[in-house]
Amino acid sequence: MIHSLFLINCSGDIFLEKHWKSVVSQSVCDYFFEAQEKAADVENVPPVISTPHHYLISIYRDKLFFVSVIQTEVPPLFVIEFLHRVADTFQDYFGECSEAAIKDNVVIVYELLEEMLDNGFPLATESNILKELIKPPTILRSVVNSITGSSNVGDTLPTGQLSNIPWRRAGVKYTNNEAYFDVVEEIDAIIDKSGSTVFAEIQGVIDACIKLSGMPDLSLSFMNPRLLDDVSFHPCIRFKRWESERVLSFIPPDGNFRLISYRVSSQNLVAIPVYVKHSISFKENSSCGRFDITIGPKQNMGKTIEGITVTVHMPKVVLNMNLTPTQGSYTFDPVTKVLTWDVGKITPQKLPSLKGLVNLQSGAPKPEENPSLNIQFKIQQLAISGLKVNRLDMYGEKYKPFKGVKYVTKAGKFQVRT
């Protein structure tokens, strides 16, 4: 299936390659580089590229491209899912999936890729099994390996490889038994000039950190599970139980993993947490304009909105901006024409604003349209969709674990048109 894998950074350098069958020349990536040059943004590179003799299937993760080379037709989503699993494994092993982390652990990377694919076909992709086959890097283990010349490859076969629950290893023991869940939601929205919502959608995930002894059987229920659309499950979830009762029933993997990802697409269920008052104007035959924006929280949120950043791509005729913020600080890059206002957190009692003059090139025509505002923010202890965990029940073990749920809402692609 997969003949080769190339890892490419944002500069276009191939810093790692792995071949499972015959060696494929790096020149095959020229087709990928051509598509990258044509794309307006790195995220817009086509995930599937057809060449005369190969198919290139790629993903973009953490400022890296994972480009796989295929010689026969296969379901593209199958390959894309595997590439994401590779990136997730690197993240789990090294703490980050970056070029530096991969180069620092290049031996372990090749060992992992050798175990994850057998002659080009996915074999072991569960983190718990891989950690039994190849020990994660530690400072002590690295020192011992350098002295003794040994490797991180385990000397015993994994216990869960042939069981019905390959995602969980046997004999797990903890002094403190804990089960924590993070409900993280990103809101994508487009707001028009009048403040009306043109488009709104919520992308959410539930990440779990499970450190439980033995073989626990968990059931996680929600207050309002019917609002979830397009739910994607970890393989441990019993799908029939979800279909009939809307309850997540599962024997969890050990450690950190993504339990589900979901989408809320009904616009009447998507609450917009912030509003923006704006007045951006450019006069005809004038070398200056006015810029005035105010941002505030919706009254019904009840939570502090923090980490607010407003980014504006100004027209090319703008030379400079002389603005005064009532809160936070701003920067304007005269080369890229990007205005960035770091607001911080806001409260209804004092609404932050940014206003002042915009200097334009003399004799230049008036900009045809006003720029859009791109907003980033974070709200702690709130799921913007209204999703709430009801309870977590455990069966099969007699101890009482520590339980916890944390909610976070973040802005995804949040745009306000002016």
From Swiss-Prot:
Keyword Disulfide bond: no
Localization per record: Golgi apparatus; Cytoplasmic vesicle membrane
Pfam families: Adap_comp_sub, Clat_adaptor_s
UniProt domain MHD: residue ranges: 176-417
Example of a GO MF term: small GTPase binding
Main subcellular location of this protein, as a coarse class: Golgi
UniProt keywords, alphabetically: Cytoplasmic vesicle, Golgi apparatus, Host-virus interaction, Membrane, Protein transport, Transport
Membrane topology: Peripheral membrane protein
GO annotation, cellular component aspect: AP-3 adaptor complex; axon cytoplasm; clathrin adaptor complex; cytoplasmic vesicle; cytoplasmic vesicle membrane; early endosome; Golgi apparatus; lysosomal membrane
InterPro entries reported in the protein's UniProt record: Adaptor_comp_med_subunit, AP2_Mu_C_sf, AP_mu_sigma_su, Clathrin_mu, Clathrin_mu_CS, Longin-like_dom_sf, MHD
UniProt record, GO biological process: anterograde axonal transport; anterograde synaptic vesicle transport; clathrin-coated vesicle cargo loading, AP-3-mediated; endocytosis; intracellular transport; melanosome assembly; platelet dense granule organization; postsynaptic neurotransmitter receptor internalization
Gene3D superfamilies: 3.30.450.60, Mu homology domain, subdomain B
Record function comment: Part of the AP-3 complex, an adaptor-related complex which is not clathrin-associated. The complex is associated with the Golgi region as well as more peripheral structures. It facilitates the budding of vesicles from the Golgi membrane and may be directly involved in trafficking to lysosomes. In concert with the BLOC-1 complex, AP-3 is required to target cargos into vesicles assembled at cell bodies for delivery into neurites and nerve terminals.
Subunit and partners: Adaptor protein complex 3 (AP-3) is a heterotetramer composed of two large adaptins (delta-type subunit AP3D1 and beta-type subunit AP3B1 or AP3B2), a medium adaptin (mu-type subunit AP3M1 or AP3M2) and a small adaptin (sigma-type subunit APS1 or AP3S2). Interacts with AGAP1. AP-3 associates with the BLOC-1 complex.
Family to which the UniProt record says this protein belongs: Belongs to the adaptor complexes medium subunit family.
Protein name, per record: AP-3 complex subunit mu-1
Species classification: Eukaryota, Metazoa, Chordata, Craniata, Vertebrata
